[in-house]
């Protein structure tokens, strides 16, 4: 299953994020999203990029807000939303990933008979968000320590919702932390829910639906409800980067 989810690009010396993502097999990404509801980008970020991003967590001027999960019943741990201007790496991921994912999102909407279509450029989609009062950037850094976890949830911040998002693991499993698996659940009509545990290496990203996805059944296309979270961290410290493409009110 892991091999089916993981899509590797061609390795080059010190590639940029744009060239690294261009080398990914996006047809395989789309096939994995259709089959499993998620797909792994590998490589996504270099170890140096991971370390640099994680190190910004304590730099207050880079963020617009901080959330302690236990105060809101979200789980244990904390996260911080970046302020504008976004870090160069985060902005590059958002603008480079969006066109690839918009094509998949439009295909899903067409299959489901939904009228909504997403523009080709992320700037045009953000303009729609901003006209609706969604002006706050949503990319975020998450930090988990021993015993921390993230309850199953959906990242919806207003009327305009881009249906796919990406999480990058910045820490090294085993070396930096144990436990803390990324978990997806799929609630299917008149059926038991299905869970998917997604194993990630440092620098890899997982693409997954924000709230639902179309699935082909014996009677045609139906919609399944999706949630995501993180299992309990057994030891160490775990950092992740969340790339959400719609802005918040």
Task: Annotate the PLM regions.
Residues 139-141, 166-168, 241-245:
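A structural signal for short, well-ordered beta-strand segments
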Residues 150-157:
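Histidine-centered catalytic micro-motifs
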Residues 46, 146, 235-236:
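Short strand-connecting beta-turns/loops that link adjacent beta-strands
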Residues 28-126:
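Non-heme Fe(II)/2-oxoglutarate
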Residues 134-146:
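A short glycine-rich, His/Asp/Glu-containing loop-to-beta-strand
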Residues 162, 173, 177-249:
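Catalytic core of Fe(II)/2-oxoglutarate
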Residues 1-35:
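Fe(II)/2-oxoglutarate
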Residues 143-146, 159-176:
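Short, conserved beta-strand element in jelly-roll/cupin
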């Amino acid at each position: 299953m892991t091999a089916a989810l993981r899509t590797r690009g061609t390795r080059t010396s010190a590639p940029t994020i744009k060239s690294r993502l261009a080398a990914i097999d996006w047809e395989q990404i789309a096939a994995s999203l259709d089959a499993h509801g998620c797909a792994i980008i590998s490589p996504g970020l270099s170890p140096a990029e991971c370390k640099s991003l994680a190190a910004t967590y304590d730099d207050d001027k880079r963020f617009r807000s901080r959330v302690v999960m236990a105060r809101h019943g979200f789980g244990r741990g904390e996260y911080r939303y970046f302020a504008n201007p976004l870090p160069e790496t985060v902005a590059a991921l958002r603008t480079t990933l969006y066109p690839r994912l918009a094509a998949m999102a439009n295909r899903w909407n067409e299959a489901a008979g939904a009228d909504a279509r997403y523009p080709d450029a992320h700037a045009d989609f953000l303009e729609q968000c901003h006209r609706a009062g969604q002006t706050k950037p949503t990319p975020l850094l998450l930090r988990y320590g021993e015993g921390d976890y993230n309850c199953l949830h959906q990242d919806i911040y207003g009327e305009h919702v881009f249906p796919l998002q990406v999480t990058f693991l910045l820490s090294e499993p085993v070396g930096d932390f144990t436990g803390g698996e990324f978990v997806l659940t799929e609630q299917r009509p008149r059926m038991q829910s299905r869970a998917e545990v997604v194993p990630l290496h440092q620098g890899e990203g997982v693409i997954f639906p924000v709230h639902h996805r179309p699935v082909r059944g014996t009677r045609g296309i139906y919609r399944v409800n999706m949630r995501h979270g993180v299992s309990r961290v057994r030891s160490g410290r775990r950092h992740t980067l969340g790339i959400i493409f719609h802005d918040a009110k």
